[in-house]
């Protein structure tokens, strides 16, 4: 233990760069974009939370695709080894290579995969056709806008060049299309068998791939069960 008034410090310190984003002092736009560039972290936390509470195989597969996408990004960066712009003004960044942008690749994978899921995987099951299409269009527009803004933030904050975020977006989009096709054609037919495994039953892993609109299904089933229990409770009180 150090004596009073003395500190024994390590020779060097390293920051946790996962949430470390720098922006120009006094720049409000840069400040907002710095927070926006943390979107991938928020999305990953959301996925983990969703998997813990829903335990659905397609969600697990989606997260697996995101992890694979990050691995591909790391591999491409270390093959190309293109430096970041301006000689690397951010000394605490995780890697000195910038081609392609991992933030851009992540966000475009997430947005394009979600876009394909909304329009090709989820199908209309009720009569509110207009409202169903409206919320899909609005959500898709929001996802694509978020992907663009996160990509733009990496250029604005001098973490990447335009070409680096552009190629990151292209790589993420292509990975999303490939992973969506692989999930639909290869993994989805296996989901019922995987859900029947003893370990899956132990952890309450479920498969909803045969349900066209999970949101509508869960809503109707929950509402019907709540009404049924309410009737039973009313009968007991009489």
Swiss-Prot record:
Q: What is its EC number?
A: 3.6.1.43
What this protein catalyses is: a di-trans,poly-cis-dolichyl diphosphate + H2O = a di-trans,poly-cis-dolichyl phosphate + phosphate + H(+)
List, alphabetically, the Gene3D superfamilies matched. Answer: Phosphatidic acid phosphatase type 2/haloperoxidase
- A GO molecular-function term, please? dolichyldiphosphatase activity
Residue ranges crossing the lipid bilayer per the database entry:
33-53, 100-120, 130-150, 162-182
Write out the GO biological process terms: lipid biosynthetic process; protein N-linked glycosylation
> Main subcellular localization, coarse class?
endoplasmic reticulum
Q: What class of enzyme is it?
A: hydrolase
Query: Where does the record place it?
Result: Endoplasmic reticulum membrane
What metabolic or biological pathway is this protein involved in? Protein modification; protein glycosylation
Alphabetized UniProt keyword annotations: Endoplasmic reticulum, Hydrolase, Membrane, Transmembrane, Transmembrane helix
| Membrane topology field | Multi-pass membrane protein
Q: What does UniProt give as GO cellular component?
A: endoplasmic reticulum membrane
Give the family this protein belongs to, as stated in its UniProt record: Belongs to the dolichyldiphosphatase family.
Q: What does this protein do?
A: Required for efficient N-glycosylation. Necessary for maintaining optimal levels of dolichol-linked oligosaccharides. Hydrolyzes dolichyl pyrophosphate at a very high rate and dolichyl monophosphate at a much lower rate. Does not act on phosphatidate.
Name of the protein in question: Dolichyldiphosphatase 1
């Amino acid at each position: 233990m150090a004596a009073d008034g003395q500190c024994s410090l390590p020779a060097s310190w390293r920051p946790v760069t996962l949430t470390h984003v720098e922006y120009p002092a006094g720049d409000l736009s840069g400040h907002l974009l710095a927070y926006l560039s943390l979107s991938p972290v928020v999305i990953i936390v959301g996925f983990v939370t969703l998997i813990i509470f829903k335990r659905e195989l397609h969600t697990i597969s989606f997260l697996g695709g995101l992890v694979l996408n990050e691995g591909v990004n790391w591999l491409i960066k270390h093959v190309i080894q293109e430096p970041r712009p301006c000689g690397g003004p951010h000394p605490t960044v995780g890697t000195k290579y910038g081609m392609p942008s991992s933030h851009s690749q992540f966000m475009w994978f997430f947005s394009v995969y979600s876009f394909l899921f909304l329009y090709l995987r989820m199908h209309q099951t009720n009569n509110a056709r207009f409202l169903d299409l409206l919320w899909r269009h609005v959500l898709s527009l929001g996802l694509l806008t978020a992907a663009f803004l996160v990509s733009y933030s990496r250029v604005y904050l001098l973490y990447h060049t335009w070409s680096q975020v552009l190629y990151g977006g292209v790589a993420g989009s292509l990975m999303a299309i490939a992973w969506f096709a692989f999930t639909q054609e290869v993994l989805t037919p296996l989901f019922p068998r995987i859900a029947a495994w003893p370990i899956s039953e132990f952890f309450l892993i479920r498969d909803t791939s045969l349900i066209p609109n999970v949101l509508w299904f869960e809503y109707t089933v929950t509402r019907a069960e709540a009404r049924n229990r309410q009737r039973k409770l009313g009968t007991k009180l009489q």
